[in-house]
């Protein structure tokens, strides 16, 4: 159990003193002392020898956590990968004796939404005459590539298999059952807390529309979200409220040490992100247990992810097959490199020359995702998911029994608005409900589009357009919508 588990310092022992001009992998699950080894053993050893140290983090939350823990360490340069990329774009080329690449899955995992991961990647990979330590609990694919490409030798791999001995049960569910699951938990107990990872801002908004102020909500600071509370975690607990909904912004750097946190639900699609999300809880003792809930995507949803992934890859593969022909076609279409880079996440433009370039980290991530999604298309999402999660969690899988049926938010809205006259302002509000709750993002949201969505969702309602014929009315001769029962 928890009291007898190994820590990474037990595996490395004093071997770190023999690391010379090499690259090292430290791979182990959360709670195995990776960070403590770096801060309490490795960094002091280098600092006492007068060496220069760079510590890289992938999230601001992790940066803040590390900064608090290394207050007594003078001489360490602490940066996020994103800050390093900004410095490199300015031409900065500082050198260090030791580089800690913490949460190094960043190079692949963030590559889909950060166009400059290549800069940090090339900088770290290009380090010479020093030691680079790659640290992560979930960078399996990245570590495999490091070994396959000869970057890291097998003698410099230190790992501890991930343990989920604190997990009591594992469940799977489909999207429509999320609120049912949560409502069932809330009804069964009056203290157990729930952490939910949603896959989009639209889903976060939908949950806020349903649960309102009874829950906390977290998202990236770059998102304009009036109801998000980014300081809702105090002393590694979320206080006062029993629910926290978050996007993948909380995938690491935030540890939750709270024996009331008994349920972690994830709707994320990317399995590497899922592994990060379920690692947020740090059990206190063997009595501190938790259940996991994984959303299962059907074949149609998996195919949608595949189409989206392929759309990005195909353009880049045409470019790589014949660069000259590709660039000539750009000229013919009167397009420049920056326009292409804005449309395609794998391309970026060199900040000095403006030349079109391929982000190799992003390309690798898209290629890996293609292989994974093709596997899902053939064998099913759930099969591939549990293959990655491992047999320990698979063996804890149980059937989900739900007695509480949650209300349908949108159906309640339709019932409330039934037979009411909806003029221009009310129509605008209704369209916002279609967007926020049903995820409708068509450019033109006319009455036919809205009725099509109602039909797709099998709601027994339709919207009709009418004209006010009451001469005494202030809205005489104006058109309005009305929601009618079919």
Pin down the residues of each PLM region.
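SF2 helicase catalytic motif II
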Residues: 92-127
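Interdomain hinge/linker at the junction between the two RecA-like core domains of SF2 helicases
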Residues: 139-185
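Inter-Walker segment of RecA-like/P-loop motor cores
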Residues: 55-97, 227-234
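Conserved helicase ATPase core of P-loop NTP-dependent helicases/translocases
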Residues: 216-247
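Conserved strand-helix element at the start of the C-terminal RecA-like helicase core
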Residues: 30, 35, 53-63, 184-211
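Conserved SF2 helicase motif VI
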Residues: 267-292
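The feature captures the C-terminal accessory region of ATP-dependent helicases
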Residues: 41-42, 309-486
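Conserved helicase ATPase motor motifs in RecA-like P-loop NTPase domains
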Residues: 27-32, 105-106, 120-147
């Amino acid at each position: 159990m928890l009291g007898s588990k190994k820590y990474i310092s037990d595996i490395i022992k004093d071997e770190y003193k023999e690391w010379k001009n090499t690259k090292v992998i430290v791979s182990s699950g959360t709670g195995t002392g990776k960070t403590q080894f770096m801060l309490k053993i490795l960094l002091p050893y280098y600092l006492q020898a007068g060496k220069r140290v760079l510590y890289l983090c992938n999230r601001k939350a992790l940066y803040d956590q590390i900064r608090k823990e290394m207050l007594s360490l003078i001489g360490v340069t602490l940066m996020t990968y994103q800050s390093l990329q900004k410095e490199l774009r300015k031409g900065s080329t500082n050198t260090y004796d030791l580089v800690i690449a913490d949460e190094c899955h960043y190079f692949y995992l963030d590559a889909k939404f950060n166009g400059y991961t290549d800069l940090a990647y090339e900088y770290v990979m290009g380090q010479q005459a020093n030691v680079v330590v790659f640290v992560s609990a979930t960078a399996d694919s990245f570590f495999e590539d490091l070994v396959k490409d000869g970057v890291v030798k097998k003698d410099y791999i230190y790992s501890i298999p991930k343990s989920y001995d604190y997990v009591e049960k594992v469940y799977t569910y489909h999207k429509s059952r999320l609120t049912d699951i949560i409502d069932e938990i809330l009804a069964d107990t009056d203290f157990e807390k729930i952490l939910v990872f949603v896959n989009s801002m639209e889903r976060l908004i939908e949950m806020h529309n349903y649960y309102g102020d009874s829950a906390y909500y977290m998202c990236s600071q770059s998102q304009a979200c009036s109801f998000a509370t980014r300081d809702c975690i105090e002393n590694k607990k979320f206080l006062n409220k029993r629910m926290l909904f978050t996007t993948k912004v909380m995938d690491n750097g935030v540890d939750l040490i709270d024996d009331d946190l008994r349920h972690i639900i994830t709707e994320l699609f990317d399995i590497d992100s899922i592994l990060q999300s379920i690692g947020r809880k740090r059990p206190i003792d063997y009595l501190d247990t938790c259940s996991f809930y994984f959303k299962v995507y059907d074949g149609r949803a998996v195919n949608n992810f595949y189409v989206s992934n392929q759309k990005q890859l195909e353009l880049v593969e045409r470019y790589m097959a014949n660069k000259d022909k590709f660039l000539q076609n750009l000229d013919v279409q009167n397009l420049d490199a920056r326009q292409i880079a804005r449309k395609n996440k794998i391309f970026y433009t060199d900040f000095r020359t403006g030349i079109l370039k391929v982000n190799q980290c992003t390309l690798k991530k898209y290629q890996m995702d293609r292989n994974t999604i093709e596997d899902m298309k053939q064998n099913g999402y759930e099969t591939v998911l549990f293959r990655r999660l491992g047999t320990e969690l698979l063996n804890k899988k149980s059937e989900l029994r739900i007695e509480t049926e949650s209300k349908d938010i949108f159906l309640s809205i339709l019932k409330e608005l039934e037979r009411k006259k909806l003029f221009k302002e009310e129509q605008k509000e209704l369209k916002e409900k279609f967007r926020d709750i049903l995820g409708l993002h068509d450019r033109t949201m006319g009455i036919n589009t809205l009725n099509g969505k109602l039909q797709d969702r099998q709601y027994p309602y339709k919207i009709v357009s009418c004209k006010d014929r009451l001469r005494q009315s202030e809205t005489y001769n104006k058109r309005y919508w009305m929601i009618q029962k079919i």
